[in-house]
């Protein structure tokens, strides 16, 4: 850089009093080390004491304002210090990585230097990678490549930063291109570059390429194995994660706490308590660090695998409990149905953030206690904790459970009012809520408003249309889903087959059931078989339903046998119905519904003695019919009514009104029948 030009471009602004005093005090102490070189500046190198101990560089650490920074830069230009690579890179590093982060200005300085070194490029790229606009780091990388100077050639510090940005933004294809540059520069043998590329692919869910890079590299270390294990865990391939660990063991690589987090979390996904205990024993026997993330993973594993007492023991022994620790225990108790214990822990927390509220609300939804979930949501609002997307999803699920349409509409308005992004997850929850609460037209409206749809979105609308008996429209959305290149899953087919069942579309149902395996490589589960048996049973094709059950690769459960019994009662097939009832009573002799169906089937076949026997068997076994429960939403409050319930204070008035309504209905029906007879005579 030409110094005279630099002085014209950036004359030093007047020094602020504070900075002026600092410069003066430094210059008094180092009068010999700060000569003026306005005419012939020395090309200082980084070993020269003038550079290493220059007061201008030490003042950088005290900068709080861009104005101060510019004053120091101006003095560096005047004194020739800016020409030293070490000094200029220190200035750029401060701009890019300091707390204040003057990123745009760091680029200006970088471009003003004739041959910036690789350190200057790397710190600026890193600064942008940690900013609100990390994609800018790729543009800077392209500029660095165009610069073409051998001093600014990318090195083994450049690529881990770029791979991390690709990982954070899920840019697998761009990461693949950058990997090509790494191979060209022969940097793949540097372990931290190699590991960063594996981590990038794993973070993007691209385990095929992650495994390929891993297999082809001669520099595997513990970090490489951990990237692979945790990558498989992240995409739900828990068995593969454990398999990779076994390979790691066979190569003599010892695990650490990060390895164990991946393995313990994999056991949580599989519900494998025994293997989880084995890994826990390994941690204790080999003295691995019990880090907070590992302890939280162990608590989560024990609670999800049904050993909530061991999870609580670990929790109670924790010296320092994080918000994640509390959330894990609260979620664990809620998952086990121990909502009262969960609530006590929740109340013990002094400071509750949105994650903790979400754990409590989500636990209530999971335990099918929708009213409690919505009550918690109201408490959350009074506590001035701002709900997030997860809160809304949990609350919409609660509305779906209760059929609370008014509350669901209020939540929808809340989302719109506070401009929460209607992404796939939130949009899908709204579609599901409207469909299950009876407003299919609004469900369709929300569906069409979602810009990017996935299999869950289509599954929600297909299931909703099936629930409303609109089989043909459900099938049309399934076809649209396939045309869009979105693969259906097992839950999609539950909605699709249910639509065929409600619409009486027997052959279409057969075809889709067959296509599950032949076209989409999906294995039908018990739920799919129960829907098919229901479809065939309702159509009177009971022998075909029986043959389908015999061909099942697994034992039929109560839902499958129940569907067959219902069809037998509907069409009067007593022999096959008795076979189904016998199996059902073996599975659960306390289920009152079996006796009721059996009694009804015998009654419709005029087999009164057998009907009496079914009722007598029910009484002898002490089985009582579970009373039905209905709910109604009034002014946003969901009220539940149980059959023959007289616990309410106004029960007498309620039953009087019901009797009155019953009389009116009977008299209205009598009038209708009389008019019908007159018309037809």
Swiss-Prot record:
Localization, UniProt? Mitochondrion
- UniProt cross-references to Pfam families, sorted A to Z: E_motif, PPR, PPR_1, PPR_2
Q: Which InterPro entries match?
A: E_motif, Pentatricopeptide_rpt, PPR_At4g14850-like_plant, TPR-like_helical_dom_sf
GO biological process terms held by the UniProt record: RNA modification
Q: Which residues cross the membrane?
A: none
Where's the transit peptide in this chain? 1-32
Which keywords, in A-to-Z order, does the entry hold?
Mitochondrion, Repeat, Transit peptide
Which segments carry the region annotation Type E(+) motif? Answer: 636-666
Which residues lie within the region annotated Type E motif? 560-635
Q: What are this entry's molecular-function GO terms?
A: RNA binding
PPR repeat copies, ranges: 117-151, 155-189, 190-220, 221-255, 256-290, 291-321, 322-356, 357-387, 388-422, 423-453, 454-488, 489-519, 525-555
Which residue pairs form cystines in this protein? none
Matching entries from PANTHER family are given as:
PENTATRICOPEPTIDE REPEAT-CONTAINING PROTEIN, PENTATRICOPEPTIDE REPEAT-CONTAINING PROTEIN ELI1, CHLOROPLASTIC-LIKE ISOFORM X2
Protein known as: Pentatricopeptide repeat-containing protein At2g22410, mitochondrial
Species = Arabidopsis thaliana (Mouse-ear cress)
